């Protein structure tokens, strides 16, 4: 999906990406002091503004990473416009995003203190991306009738990559040891490919992709550490 595309394709791309990554935007607005309701309204209004002004089309390949673009754009939106708009004008009542405020507020209570707003945003962005990738992996394995394989081996994609006792897993899944190792290898390969595909949808070049991948890996490693 090319971020530089115009017209309906660009609009659909923006809708999909913002739908997937609304929580980092919501969390950022909350940390700027907005109430839960105001934060939700602000993100909805911000999204409508992006659609109205075709901002995805302007955030072309030379602009680099969509993550950085959205963070800067939302920060400016909150500072320059949001606080000056009346509640009656906030998106005109339209709510194009599906925002689960209850879930978001619960998640915010689990966040670690001591980091900056931008660090929190990047971490939440990284987690949203990983959750999106896991969803794709789960659907892929379900389509192949391999749900049990995914559920039993998905630990190989997390933390230190361990996934349990190989012999025990082989017996449980009715695979050989080599079959388990092959399944783990393929799952890791597909995981990396999906991560790169998701990132590619938010950047303008292969160089940006490599930078973004490296950055998000550091973000996750720092949080886990």
Please report, for each region that a protein language model flagged, where it lies by residue.
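Intrinsic, short, N-terminal disordered tails of RNA polymerase sigma-factor systems
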Residues: 1-225
């Amino acid at each position: 999906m090319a971020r530089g595309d115009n017209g309906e394709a660009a609009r659909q791309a923006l809708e999909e990406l913002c739908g997937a990554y609304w929580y980092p935007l919501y969390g950022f607005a909350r940390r700027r002091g907005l109430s839960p309701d105001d934060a939700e309204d602000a993100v909805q209004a911000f999204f409508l503004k992006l659609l109205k002004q075709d901002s995805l089309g302007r955030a072309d390949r030379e602009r680099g990473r969509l993550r950085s673009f959205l963070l800067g754009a939302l920060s400016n939106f909150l500072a320059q416009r949001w606080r000056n708009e009346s509640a009656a004008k906030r998106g005109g009542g339209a709510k194009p995003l599906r925002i689960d405020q209850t879930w978001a507020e619960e998640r915010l209570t689990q966040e670690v203190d001591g980091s900056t707003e931008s660090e929190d945003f990047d971490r939440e962005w990284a987690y949203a991306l990983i959750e999106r990738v896991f969803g794709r992996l789960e659907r892929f394995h379900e389509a192949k009738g391999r749900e049990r394989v995914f559920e039993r081996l998905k630990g190989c994609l997390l933390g230190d990559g361990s996934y349990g006792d190989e012999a025990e897993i082989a017996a449980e899944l009715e695979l050989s040891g080599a079959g388990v190792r092959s399944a783990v290898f393929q799952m890791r390969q597909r995981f990396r490919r999906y991560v790169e595909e998701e990132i590619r949808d938010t950047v303008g070049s292969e160089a940006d992709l490599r930078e973004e991948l490296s950055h998000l890996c550091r973000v996750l490693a720092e949080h886990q550490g």
